[in-house]
């Protein structure tokens, strides 16, 4: 399966914002973006004239990297969002948020989306009582994600209650750290996504 090989901190510096790809490390003084908040490379500090297209492209790349999705799959999400009823940009973000790996990250069962993706691929979680290993699976209202008893001693999962208390949980999800369970209460709305994203730029880019 194709994946990013570029350093995670380099991706944040290239996009000019924290993408929280390294989980808790991003909140410490070890964060490379805090120490060097400019693009990587010899000319990273140089000021460049940025075109409208470049701004749109950077916004798309930022969101794509944040969710850890390659271009072909991201474009497929956009196509699906564009064909659905409602606002295309909001539809796109809802589809991204409803990915199983993202939901597990939001519930506090992983420190980053990448870690959540790895845990899903190893079959650590069950969805409605059935073992799943597909990170891109779309959750629905009423779905229950749970960690089986035998997997609850995995360090990152054992810390779930602490992570949930520290990071909180979106209103559309219900996290039960004590029982290693999460429930999808509703579909994510635009206001549930606090990360600074200008989805209109992505729509403009793909509409050219």
Swiss-Prot record:
GO terms for biological process: ribosomal small subunit biogenesis; translation. The lineage of its organism: Bacteria, Pseudomonadati, Thermodesulfobacteriota, Desulfovibrionia, Desulfovibrionales. It holds the Pfam family Ribosomal_S4. Keywords: Ribonucleoprotein, Ribosomal protein, RNA-binding, rRNA-binding. GO terms for molecular function: rRNA binding; structural constituent of ribosome. The keyword Mitochondrion does not apply. Signal peptide: none annotated. This is Small ribosomal subunit protein uS4. Residues 98-161 form the S4 RNA-binding domain. GO terms for cellular component: small ribosomal subunit. The gene is rpsD.
